[in-house]
Amino acid sequence: MTPPTRRIGDLEVSCVGLGCMPLSNPSMLEHHDRAISTVHRALDLGVTLLDTSNIYAPSWDAVGHNEALVAEAVRTYVGPADLTLLLVTTKGGITRGDGETWGRDSSHDALRRAAEDSLAQLGVDVIDLYQHHRHDPALAYASQMVGLRKLKDDGLIRRIGLSNVNREELDVALDVLGGPRDGVVSVQNEFSPRYRRDADVLDRCTELGIAFLPWSPLGGADEAHDVGSRYAVFAEVGDEIGATPQETVIAWLLALSPVMIPIPGATRPATVESSVKAATLVLSDQQFERLTASAPADSSMYPDDLPRSPLR
């Protein structure tokens, strides 16, 4: 049941990754062993992409929690997976401070501090893929990209990805950093049956061969369990192919573009098993067209961030 692979830059990774953010939800603090087991099960099944971030934590004073958890899971793994094939990605650029004060800081010094902290939490000498989390509206976007390039030039990171970008921001990043050969290798944006506004970004990534990692591919934790009732066609097609609505969503996303690599979250090993199963499902052209024709709610998981900050 090993999932097929797709490319992120010069690397091949499983076509379905594991979004690790839910493992650091406050409700998971008393289920640490289960969190570790969830990552271990993903590795057992051939998942070679783990996505984390410095701000994924149960509280503001535990920043780095998710990175440390992922590092522990990798360090304690004794299963059959070849860990030399594993890609652990993290992010920087969003701040989370005293009393849950959220902000953005992509100044060069702040990005360096964040990357250095992530190196320590992950227990590595270099970050294989570092993703710029969100545009800092106080700074020119090109300047933020220069900061990322400096991290790469200085050997803190190997590859650069973007997150939560619009088409204009992506094009600026490409101008500064270059394309997937030696510059921008991935884009991580929201994309799901619920939210599809970034189709133009996906199209650009498909054109250039830049990996597109849709976050919250099932519409977020609050909607994932009932995605089949909110978007009935995913349940209908799922019945036709012997899959759950959630598995059908992942199969549909994979069929949208050869650069698509969903990163669904999980807090139980069984959920990872379902995601990996979805990577092997095949949709007919007619089924794919029905799913694509379904109407999105078009509401972001984080509506306060829309419309996006103006490009400066």
Please state what every model-predicted region is.
Residues 1-83:
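N-terminal binding-site loop/beta-alpha segment at the start of enzyme catalytic domains
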Residues 10-12, 44, 73-87, 119-123, ...:
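Acidic (Asp/Glu)-rich catalytic clusters
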Residues 11-16, 46-48, 80-86, 124-128, ...:
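Short, well-ordered coil/turn segments that N-cap beta-strands
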Residues 21-33, 98-109, 133-139:
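Active-site mouth loops of central-metabolism enzymes
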Residues 24-26, 56-60, 95-101, 220-224, ...:
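A short acidic, helix-capping loop that chelates divalent metal ions and anchors anionic groups
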Residues 30-43, 106-122, 170-171:
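Short, acidic/polar
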Residues 119-138:
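Active-site groove signature of glycoside hydrolases
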Residues 135-312:
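Beta/alpha (TIM)-barrel catalytic core signal, keyed to glycine-rich beta->alpha loops juxtaposed to Asp/Glu
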